[in-house]
A protein has these predicted regions:
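Short amphipathic alpha-helices in soluble, non-transmembrane regions
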Residues: 22, 70-79
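Short, well-ordered beta-strand segments in beta-rich or mixed alpha/beta enzyme
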Residues: 4-11, 41-74
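Short amphipathic alpha-helical segments
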Residues: 16-42, 80-81
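A short, structured loop/turn motif at beta-sheet edges
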Residues: 33-35, 63, 103-107
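A contiguous, mid-protein "functional segment" used to position or interact
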Residues: 61, 78, 92
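Anionic, Ser/Thr-rich low-complexity intrinsically disordered regions
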Residues: 2-4, 38, 108
Length: 109
C-alpha cells in the first residue's frame, strides 16, 4: 500500500507570524497527529522571494489512503475551522494530497 503525504502550504502575514507558529507547534499539529490518521508530521519554512509574509509547509504522512480519507471525512473540517477562526484574514492555506510512488535512500557500502 502506498503512503500518502498530506501537504499544507501556508502564507502567513508577518503580524501574526510568531503567535501562529507557536499555536501550530503547540496545538494544531499535535491535534492533527492526535487523530491517529498520520504517522508523523514535519513543519518546514519555504524560502521564496515574496513580499508581505512568510511561507510554511506542513507535511503529514498517512500510512494508507484509507487513513488519509478517514482524516478528511472525520477530522479535517473541525481542525480547519479552528485554524480559520483564529487566522481567517492573516493566513492563506493551500492543500495537496501526494501519493508516495517510491522511496529512495542512499546506499551505504
Amino acid at each position: 500500500m502506498a503512503k500518502v503525504i498530506y501537504n499544507v502550504t501556508l502564507s502567513v502575514s508577518e503580524e501574526v507570524h510568531e503567535p501562529w507558529l507557536a499555536w501550530m507547534k503547540g496545538s494544531h499539529i499535535p491535534d492533527v497527529l492526535g487523530t491517529g490518521c498520520f504517522e508523523w508530521a514535519k513543519l518546514l519554512r519555504v524560502h521564496a522571494f515574496e513580499q508581505g509574509g512568510l511561507t510554511y509547509a506542513v507535511m503529514y504522512c498517512a500510512a494508507t489512503m484509507e487513513d488519509y480519507e478517514r482524516y478528511v471525512s472525520a477530522h479535517s473540517g473541525r481542525l480547519q475551522a479552528e485554524h480559520e477562526a483564529l487566522y481567517k484574514d492573516t493566513v492563506v492555506a493551500f492543500r495537496t494530497m501526494l501519493e508516495v510512488l517510491h522511496e529512495f535512500s542512499p546506499k551505504i557500502n
